[in-house]
């Protein structure tokens, strides 16, 4: 096509252009043609421009402003140099320039001018003469009834020109336009330039107008229609009115027009905040817009719009009456907010919105008559090359941020409106969100959960309110696809749901097909903001071409089944997973709790379905809990276990609604039983056990303000006390070898049933049994339990002397009834008698006079045991070894408890082995010794008054005894470590002899056995060994 190489044609100026306008236009021209690789800045239009990414194609260029005289029109329309001809049958065509208001207004601001085309072989003199002639009518037009509401430039003398005579004298030879139109200069250099955006498809806009029938009187009679641009209701176009007016009486000042449009945009933005974007405010309520795209007529009557498919392309829209429909501009659907403004004789066209819709393609349009006389037809055809470009997400983000920052500073010029392309913002944000999505299923069961389509996934985080608002305003999102003619359509519902599908055409009818169909095929994915809910379902539904673009009509027309948030799919999946968990189908017992205790909707569904396999009808609460815990291992974090128990409580209440008043009451008792089980049978509780009365007292007032039945609480307490709660373990753990578990001997096998020494009566259950620990000393010892935990006296039936073969192995003193054999495992009875020596102190029992060679061992929990040896040397050997082990391996104590009670309590002493080196351990003991000594001195400096209560005196004595004992213990620890520490743990020279004797039976060597003569009990033995007894305390120290 001729003229395709005219893109580099030098810029030609209108004689009346000012120097400032020329400089601005030059900068724009160089920017658009000389530096096309740079980032495209914002548009300068005050109400009809939209921010576009540099790669987005634009079939419908936008218009900006001009400054003085002929540049008064705000034009941002860019015609490519490769565009097809613009014909004027029977008239001479003139070459259009961006700075010519009188000519470009005919295309962009129809009420003022008639479109003209410039032949290539003629000069620009006819244009200058036209502008001069148009200026002559400025005063006459400016004096009309239409007044400016807002003036952009006080020094600019804006007017609209009459071109009927100039058009009649213009050349009638049709020619082709070859020039690319640079952006017209804006009001000030601060306003960003409008980008030249290449289009993808050929767009032919055919306008037929009767120029000879236009009279100034007719246009003058319709001025009131122009001014009354807020008029509502259907508008009927008079038959006598011509589509295009070139009369000076029907024109008005562009400044007045812009000011009115700015005011109108604010009004329309308030009336229809979702129907307008930043570039869609040019349409007036009293304006009729008529544009045909591929055989689809889009008719606008101010705020009324109708999109339809005419039976005949030659039908005239002038005599048609349209139903009332709000006007809007949707960047997603690419609605052309190009307005064909008809007020009697006046038509106003501003083709804008397609620049906002990336990937929109429109074919060449056939001519469509807009007038009835048909004497003169004006055709405007624009041809563009086919371009396909991909979005640059990061580049769009940076461009949008720059645009927002710039436009915030130009609010006084641009007025209210959107400052960025909502489609572009959403595309970048949407890609970012997709990158951060993940599945909510557990990692172990994801591959075995169920086989569903790949489209089932959900957002970890919901869409932000800003993105949701932009989606609702845009209505739909179109993204270019490589598939022929298909586009991604993304719509949002009122609840934040997003539906993506593929459409062979644009849903507002901009396609070759007579009826555009919105297809929801198998590729469609429905996203939901709420976590853990998703579904996809193929569906095909027709879309009303005239529906409001910013609304959610598309989703509202969907059936409720297709918008069920995927609940049905999740329920079915939860049922399948729950069934497999209950039957342990490719799951272990320890895996069940992981799937029931997660904090998401799907896990809750699985737990509810899992509990349906249990029937607790007629069972007591403790029986139901035991039955439930036998099915799986209740492991995991505390909150995960509690979630599982919540589901259990709900299920029990549904099966037994009359037993307990509420679900909360059931859950409260369930947790109370779990805590009671830990208190009575737990490994870490070495203090006083909870009594039944304390259990009842703790549950007062928690049954919805009332109390539970005491009989019920007593029954639950006795049930837990007599039989502790246990849950099932995996078969693999039961079959572990002794090297992996314990040295317990049971029926000749070594199943892992006890991994820690002792039993429920042994306070040192938290000490793991190490079969590989070193043996430091062994031999026969006679044991007598003198005091239980916290110094309480031992019951009378348990105070007798018993002979054991003792083995100091690691930090544990094992007491065996049978002879020692290294290959022999310890029995349950042996483990029950074991004593931990961490933080213990062994000393000679100076207060016990009934038997010789007796030493006393006071443990960390203040148990007191008496041991008798065969000789004084052996007694001292046991004392040294026990103290040395305690000094070397005892870890630093925990800080003292902080509470509101004034009652003294000893700090906890950890049973774990210290991780400090010997030097660090020595420093730790010395530091603790110094602290205890200082505290003891302060304590004794404030003795209790004689008038205080006896309870306070006992508290004082108890603390005094504790501090004194701790001081003595740390003094011995420090002295042991200074003497050598671990070196003292090596075997002495006389030790092998004792070890040899240990392999023989005590009955075969009665001389080596301790003296077992029966001694009459003394009253002093039955005394409490608590420190408050002065006599005992004096003897012990």
Curated annotation (Swiss-Prot):
Molecular function via GO: guanyl-nucleotide exchange factor activity
> Which PROSITE patterns does the record cross-reference, listed alphabetically?
PH_DOMAIN, SEC7
Q: Which Gene3D superfamilies match?
A: Arf Nucleotide-binding Site Opener,domain 2, Pleckstrin-homology domain (PH domain)/Phosphotyrosine-binding domain (PTB)
Instruction: Please report the name of this protein according to its UniProt entry.
Output: PH and SEC7 domain-containing protein 3
What gene name is listed for this protein?
A: Psd3
Alphabetized InterPro entries for the sequence? PH-like_dom_sf, PH_9, PH_domain, Sec7_C_sf, Sec7_dom, Sec7_dom_sf
Q: Where is the composition biased (Low complexity)?
A: 237-251
Phosphoserine modification, residue list: 76, 759, 998, 1000-1001, 1003, 1009
Q: What is its main location?
A: membrane
Q: Cite the residue spans of the region called Disordered.
A: 37-70, 169-189, 236-255, 262-284, 304-335, 353-375, 730-762, 984-1037
GO BP: ARF protein signal transduction; regulation of ARF protein signal transduction
- The PH domain covers 774-887
- Coiled-coil spans are 911-941
Please give the superkingdom of this protein's source: Eukaryota
A GO cellular component term found in this entry reads:
glutamatergic synapse
* CDD domains associated with the record: PH_EFA6 (cd13295), Sec7 (cd00171)
Q: State the compartments where it is located.
A: Cell membrane; Cell projection, Ruffle membrane; Postsynaptic density
